[in-house]
């Protein structure tokens, strides 16, 4: 599971060092895909494949679901961590997420999110009231 907030820097070659505490769960490979709110999502390879198969099976008759699966699959970048725990973030993914040098990696329970630091700060500020107010549906299984 993935928890916490980290602030790695994107290097000049588009590589990002992932936090050491997450590397064991990603040692068998990972998938980088477009995420929600112009972030990137990183899933352990096997977790992603399970989810992708479920989504693909459910999407055959629903046009919105088919579009989601197509976009998800088209954005998927299968990778392995290098010896220093880095991934290469493609130019297309950097552009989609607006990544510059300063990044934020957050644990989102079963996957990671990569954000541009400024975008994460703005998103967090804009949604602080939502978190503080709580959401019975969102928190029903947690509280």
UniProtKB/Swiss-Prot annotation:
Pfam families linked to this entry: MraZ
InterPro entries for the chain: MraZ, MraZ_C, MraZ_dom, MraZ_N, MraZ_sf, SpoVT-AbrB_dom, SpoVT-AbrB_sf
Key words, A-Z: Cytoplasm, DNA-binding, Repeat, Transcription, Transcription regulation
Localisation per UniProt entry: Cytoplasm, Nucleoid
Gene Ontology cellular component list: cytoplasm; nucleoid
GO biological process terms, semicolon-separated: negative regulation of DNA-templated transcription initiation
Domain of life: Bacteria
Sequence ranges assigned to domain SpoVT-AbrB in this UniProt record: 5-47, 76-119
Gene Ontology molecular function: any one: transcription cis-regulatory region binding
PANTHER family with a match to the protein in the record: TRANSCRIPTIONAL REGULATOR MRAZ (PTHR34701:SF1)
Similarity section: Belongs to the MraZ family.
Assembly and binders: Forms oligomers.
NCBIfam families (alphabetical): division/cell wall cluster transcriptional repressor MraZ
The name this protein goes by in its record: Transcriptional regulator MraZ
Organism for this UniProt entry: Corynebacterium urealyticum (strain ATCC 43042 / DSM 7109)
Gene (UniProt): mraZ
């Amino acid at each position: 599971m993935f928890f916490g907030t980290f602030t790695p820097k994107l290097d000049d070659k588009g590589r990002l060092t992932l936090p050491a505490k997450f590397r064991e769960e990603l040692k068998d490979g990972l998938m980088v895909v477009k995420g929600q709110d112009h972030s990137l999502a990183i899933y352990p390879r096997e977790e992603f494949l399970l989810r992708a198969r479920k989504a693909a099976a459910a999407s055959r008759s629903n046009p919105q679901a088919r579009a989601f699966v197509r976009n998800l699959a088209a954005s998927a970048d299968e990778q392995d961590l290098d010896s220093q725990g880095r991934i290469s973030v493609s130019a297309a993914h950097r552009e989609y997420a607006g990544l510059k040098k300063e990044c934020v990696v957050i644990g989102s329970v079963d996957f990671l999110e990569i954000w541009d630091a400024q975008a994460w700060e703005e998103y967090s500020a804009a949604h602080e009231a939502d978190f503080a107010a709580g959401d019975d549906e969102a928190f029903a299984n947690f509280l």
